[in-house]
């Protein structure tokens, strides 16, 4: 939790104002931030200086794992984060590749499960990684990438957290996740939960111990309409102890994640927090 607040303070102290053309707002911005999550110790990085909700973040991750491309599918599993980008983003509404209400296009999980090949076929990146790791194989290329510039025009949003690189050392699995851009007050809370949970799940379904997750962010920013709440409220609160994430031990395969797993299979224990803060969201 301290590393999160340290990043927020760094942005406030050292950040540069940058105009964001997509949102029409200014962002206080720093370049390069590194966060580390001790998955092996189950120090779940759920923000404690404001009330935070983990289930929507895990639901979104589950939707990516399943390759969902429709906001309605995300809603069914408890995640509403794609409603605005699918239906309120004017550039996407005018895009000829949009198939209709709730369509997200070829974003995130679609790329992870069905990356298009020149011959017309697709590559299931996640399946390959799971198969390798289950056999104890790390070919130094166990990489899940959502970043496909050739199809950016076919989706409502470029991926922010775009690449997950798995590394197997002995019987311990580690993860390095790369993020090009991060809305620190709102998005990072989601992203931290997802990086942690992705490593925990992948270790569980491939039969390994979970090690450390490394989260690398390039552009870390606070929007101008979020700054006052962060600077004058959240950052002044004392962080509390990290909670624990409990995952149903019956989840043993990628097929389980694709079929029957729900948010009831995840529980956070020992979560103490300060009062909620409602930050503005920028579409």
Curated annotation (Swiss-Prot):
Compartments (UniProt record): Cytoplasm
GO cellular component, one term: cytosol
Record keywords: Cytoplasm, Methyltransferase, Nucleotide biosynthesis, Transferase
Enzyme Commission designation: 2.1.1.45
Pathway noted in the entry: Pyrimidine metabolism; dTTP biosynthesis
Lineage top rank: taxon: Bacteria
Keyword Cytoplasm included in the entry's annotation: yes
Active site per database record: 160
Main location: cytoplasm
One of the Pfam families matching this protein, by short name: Thymidylat_synt
Broadest EC class assigned to this enzyme: transferase
Keyword Transferase appears in the UniProt entry: yes
Catalytic activity: dUMP + (6R)-5,10-methylene-5,6,7,8-tetrahydrofolate = 7,8-dihydrofolate + dTMP
Residues reported in the UniProt entry to bind (6R)-5,10-methylene-5,6,7,8-tetrahydrofolate: 183, 282
A single GO BP: dTMP biosynthetic process
Gene3D superfamilies membership: Thymidylate synthase/dCMP hydroxymethylase domain (3.30.572.10)
Binding site for dUMP: 22, 180-183, 191, 221-223
Secretion signal, residue range per the UniProt entry: none
HAMAP family (alphabetical): Thymidy_synth_bact
Subunit structure: Homodimer.
Family: Belongs to the thymidylate synthase family. Bacterial-type ThyA subfamily.
Protein name: Thymidylate synthase
Annotated organism of origin: Shewanella halifaxensis (strain HAW-EB4)
Gene name of the encoded protein: thyA
């Amino acid at each position: 939790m301290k590393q999160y607040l340290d990043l927020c303070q760094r942005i406030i102290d050292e950040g540069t104002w940058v105009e964001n053309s997509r949102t029409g707002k200014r962002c206080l911005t720093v370049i390069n931030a590194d966060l580390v999550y001790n998955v092996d110790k189950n120090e779940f990085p759920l923000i404690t200086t404001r009330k935070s909700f983990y289930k929507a973040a895990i639901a979104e991750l589950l939707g990516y794992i399943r390759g969902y491309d429709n906001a309605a599918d995300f809603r069914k599993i408890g995640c509403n984060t794609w409603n605005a980008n699918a239906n309120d983003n004017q550039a996407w509404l005018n895009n000829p590749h949009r198939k209709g209400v709730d369509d997200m296009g070829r974003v995130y999980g679609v790329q992870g499960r069905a990356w298009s090949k020149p011959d017309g076929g697709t590559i299931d990146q996640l399946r390959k990684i799971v198969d390798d790791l289950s056999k104890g194989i790390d070919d130094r290329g166990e990489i899940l990438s959502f970043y496909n510039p050739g199809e950016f025009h076919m989706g409502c949003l470029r991926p922010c957290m775009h690449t997950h690189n798995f590394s197997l050392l002995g019987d311990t699995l580690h993860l390095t996740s790369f993020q090009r851009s991060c809305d620190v007050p709102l998005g990072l809370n989601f992203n931290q939960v997802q990086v942690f949970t992705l490593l925990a799940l992948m270790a569980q379904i491939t039969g390994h111990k979970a090690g450390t997750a490394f989260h690398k962010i390039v552009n870390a920013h606070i929007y101008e309409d979020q700054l006052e709440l962060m600077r004058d409220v959240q950052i002044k609160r004392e962080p509390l102890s990290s909670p624990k994430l409990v995952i149903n031990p019956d989840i043993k395969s990628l097929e389980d994640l694709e079929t029957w797993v729900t948010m009831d299979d995840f529980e956070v224990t020992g979560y103490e927090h300060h009062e909620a803060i409602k930050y503005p969201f920028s579409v």
